[in-house]
C-alpha cells in the first residue's frame, strides 16, 4: 500500500504498517488519556465526511476499515452493521473491485464477532447480497453468496448450503471465475462430508483441485484444500498414512500465513492419524518438533491423553480422556466420526493386554478386569479370533478362552529351504548345459 500524506487532526489514520504516522490504534498506545470511544467518534466523523480527491478517498477507505476493526474488537455488532449501511453511498462512487473488497472485509469483521445469533449473521449477508443485486454488482454478489455458503457450513446448516452452492457453481462456471469457484466447491465438499455423503464430497473436492491447478492459489486456500483432502482420505479409505501427509502440508501452509487456529486443527488431526496408525508413541516426538513447539492448548492436551491411553492399552483411560475433553473430542466432527473405530481399537488393545499372561483365562475374569458386560467381551473375542487378531478359541461351555501359543518361525529352517531351492536350480542348469554338449 503506498504511503499517503495525512492531515494534522487525523494522526495519520490508515491500516498499512508502511505509513509513517501509523494508525489511530498505534497512536492510542502512546496516548493513554484517550480511549476507544474517542477514536470511534473521530473515525466516525471521518467516515461521514464527504471525500473529494484521491487522497481523501484513500483516507476514508482506511478510516472505514480501522473503525470496523475497532467496533469488531469491542463487539459492537449493531454499530458495525449500521456503519456498513452508512458507507454504501460512498461505496457506489468507488470502483467495483475496490468496493467489493471493502464490503467483504467489513462483512467478515461482523461475522467474526462471537455471541451472535446465526439468523442475524445470515440476515446481514443476505441484506448485502440484495444491495449488490440492486446495484448490479455481479462479482460482489457472487463473492457474498460464496461467503453465505461458508457461513451455512459454519452454522452446521449443511442442507441449506448445498443448493446455494450448486446454483453458484453453475453460474461461476459460465463466467469462468475460477478463484471463487474453488472456494465454493471446497465448501460444497465440506457440506457433503458432514452429511456423510463421502462420494459426493470427494467429487466436489476433485473439482476444486482441478480448478485450482489452472490458477494461482494463495497459501491459505491451498492449505484448506490439503486439510479437506486429509479428512476425506481418513474417512473414505481409512488411509491414515496419506491423510497424515495432507494434514502436514495443511499445517505448514496455515503456519506460513499465521493462521494459528487452522494450523492447530491440522496438527490435531496429524496426532489423530498417529493414534489410528497404532503409533501413539510418536505423538510426543511430533509435538516436540521445531514447527509445533509454539502451539499448545486443550486440543493438543486431548490428543496427548488419547495417545497416552493407547500406549497403556487402557480402555478406561481412553474413556476418561474422551469425557474430560468433550469440546475438543466429542464436538469435533472429524474426531467424532472416528470415535467408534477408536473405541473398538482401544477395546482390542485392552483385551490383548489382559489376556497376554494367560494360556487359559475365564471370560468372566476378563470382563471384570475391563469393566464391561461379559456378553460384549465374548462377542468381541469371537470377532478378534475370526479376524485373526487373536490366536485362540472359546470354550463357551466352560466360559473359558484358550490362548494358543504363536510359534516363532525358525529362520534357519527357511534359510535351509532357500539354499536347497537354489542348489536345485544350479543342478538343473548344469544338466541342461551337459545335454547340449552331448
Curated annotation (Swiss-Prot):
Keyword Flavoprotein: no
Domain of life: Eukaryota
UniProt-listed InterPro entries: 26S_Proteasome/COP9_Components, PCI_dom, Rpn6_C_helix, Rpn6_N, WH_DNA-bd_sf
Stretches the record annotates as Disordered: 1-30
Keywords attached to this entry: Proteasome
Annotated transmembrane regions: none
One GO location term (cellular component): proteasome regulatory particle, lid subcomplex
Gene Ontology terms describing biological process: determination of adult lifespan; proteasome assembly; ubiquitin-dependent protein catabolic process
Molecular-function GO term, any one: structural molecule activity
PCI domain residues: 239-408
Annotated knockout phenotype: Embryonic lethal, larval arrest.
Function: Component of the lid subcomplex of the 26S proteasome, a multiprotein complex involved in the ATP-dependent degradation of ubiquitinated proteins. In the complex, rpn-6.1 is required for proteasome assembly. Plays a key role in increased proteasome activity in response to proteotoxic stress: induced by daf-16, promoting enhanced assembly of the 26S proteasome and higher proteasome activity, leading to extended lifespan.
Subunit structure: Component of the lid subcomplex of the 19S proteasome regulatory particle complex (also named PA700 complex). The 26S proteasome consists of a 20S proteasome core and two 19S regulatory subunits.
Family assignment from sequence similarity: Belongs to the proteasome subunit S9 family.
The protein, known as: Probable 26S proteasome regulatory subunit rpn-6.1
Organism whose genome encodes this protein: Caenorhabditis elegans
Amino acid at each position: 500500500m503506498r504511503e499517503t500524506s495525512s492531515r494534522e487532526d487525523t494522526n495519520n489514520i490508515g491500516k498499512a504498517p508502511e505509513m509513517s504516522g501509523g494508525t489511530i490504534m498505534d497512536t492510542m498506545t502512546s496516548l493513554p488519556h484517550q480511549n476507544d470511544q474517542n477514536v470511534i467518534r473521530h473515525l466516525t466523523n471521518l467516515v461521514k465526511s464527504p471525500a473529494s480527491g484521491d487522497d481523501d478517498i484513500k483516507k476514508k477507505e482506511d478510516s472505514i476499515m480501522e473503525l470496523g476493526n475497532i467496533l469488531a474488537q469491542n463487539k459492537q455488532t449493531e454499530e458495525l452493521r449500521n456503519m456498513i449501511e452508512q458507507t454504501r453511498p460512498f461505496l457506489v462512487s468507488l470502483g467495483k473491485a475496490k468496493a467489493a473488497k471493502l464490503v467483504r472485509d467489513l462483512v467478515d469483521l461482523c461475522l467474526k464477532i462471537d455471541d451472535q445469533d446465526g439468523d442475524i449473521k445470515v440476515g446481514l449477508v443476505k441484506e448485502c447480497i440484495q444491495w449488490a443485486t440492486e446495484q448490479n454488482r455481479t462479482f460482489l454478489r457472487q463473492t457474498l453468496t460464496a461467503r453465505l455458503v461458508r457461513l451455512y457450513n459454519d452454522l452446521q446448516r449443511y442442507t441449506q448450503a448445498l443448493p446455494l452452492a450448486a446454483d453458484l457453481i453453475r453460474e461461476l462456471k459460465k463466467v469462468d471465475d475460477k478463484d471463487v469457484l474453488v472456494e465454493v466447491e471446497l465448501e460444497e465438499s465440506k457440506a457433503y462430508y458432514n452429511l456423510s455423503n463421502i462420494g459426493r464430497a470427494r467429487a466436489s473436492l476433485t473439482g476444486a483441485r482441478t480448478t485450482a491447478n489452472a490458477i494461482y492459489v494463495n497459501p491459505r486456500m491451498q492449505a484448506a484444500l490439503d486439510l479437506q483432502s486429509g479428512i476425506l482420505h481418513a474417512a473414505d479409505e481409512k488411509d491414515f498414512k496419506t491423510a497424515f501427509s495432507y494434514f502436514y502440508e495443511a499445517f505448514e501452509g496455515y503456519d506460513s500465513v499465521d493462521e494459528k487456529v487452522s494450523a492447530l486443527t491440522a496438527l490435531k488431526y496429524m496426532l489423530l492419524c498417529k493414534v489410528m496408525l497404532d503409533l501413539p508413541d510418536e505423538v510426543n516426538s511430533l509435538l516436540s518438533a521445531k514447527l509445533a513447539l509454539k502451539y499448545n492448548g486443550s486440543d493438543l492436551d486431548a490428543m496427548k491423553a488419547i495417545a497416552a491411553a493407547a500406549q497403556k492399552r487402557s480402555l478406561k483411560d481412553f474413556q476418561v480422556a474422551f469425557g474430560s475433553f468433550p469440546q475438543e473430542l466429542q464436538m469435533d466432527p472429524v474426531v467424532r466420526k472416528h470415535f467408534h473405530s477408536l473405541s473398538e481399537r482401544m477395546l482390542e488393545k485392552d483385551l490383548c493386554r489382559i489376556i497376554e499372561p494367560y494360556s487359559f483365562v475365564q471370560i468372566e475374569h476378563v470382563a471384570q478386569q475391563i469393566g464391561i458386560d461379559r456378553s460384549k467381551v465374548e462377542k468381541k473375542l469371537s470377532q478378534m479370533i475370526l479376524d485373526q487378531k487373536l490366536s485362540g478359541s472359546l470354550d463357551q461351555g466352560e466360559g473359558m478362552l484358550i490362548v494358543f501359543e504363536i510359534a516363532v518361525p525358525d529362520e534357519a529352517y527357511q534359510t535351509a529351504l532357500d539354499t536347497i531351492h537354489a542348489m536345485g536350480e544350479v543342478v538343473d542348469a548344469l544338466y541342461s548345459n551337459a545335454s547340449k554338449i552331448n
